[in-house]
């Protein structure tokens, strides 16, 4: 279902980002020595500015949530048992339903998952499964090239221009009907050591989410789909709330 509200929110946000773009913001971003290739089509000035804004607005709270994980584990290590939070009693005691699902997520009986490697993406989208969960997390080694090329592969897939030719000359390309894409970004505890903002590593979660959302949301909505995310390894409702705010 085409979401006009989300589309106009994106257009406004992107225009605002471009309006606020300045060299001071970009100078906050540095790259680790291992990040030798820049990937200019992915790491545009506008995209980097978007990552900086995400980092400055949300990373502080993320670090607080990670600190809370340590404190919670210490509490359990002392022999205490988990308990339901008092402040969420109304959720447990009342009747409620989740918001309606988008049309292209109504049937998820057959899904496939794998890393964001180019051939894998093509085969997964052509597999006949209803959903492909493109994984930046466990199944993807987070090297600089894997992360950046994974983003480019997804851009090409969403624009339906992705193809791959192996060493024997066999060409892979998309069928007319393909699976719906869900992105699995890295967990909250994982940093991306290759991108630094003000000298500090950025959250891998924000890199995976930010670059994918920035480059693809307009085309996804045009495709009558949307930016869908599988959020791994959440340990508390406050962490889910953090993602909702992002």
What are these regions (language model features)?
Residues 97-99:
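N-terminal flexible segment immediately upstream of the FAD-binding catalytic core
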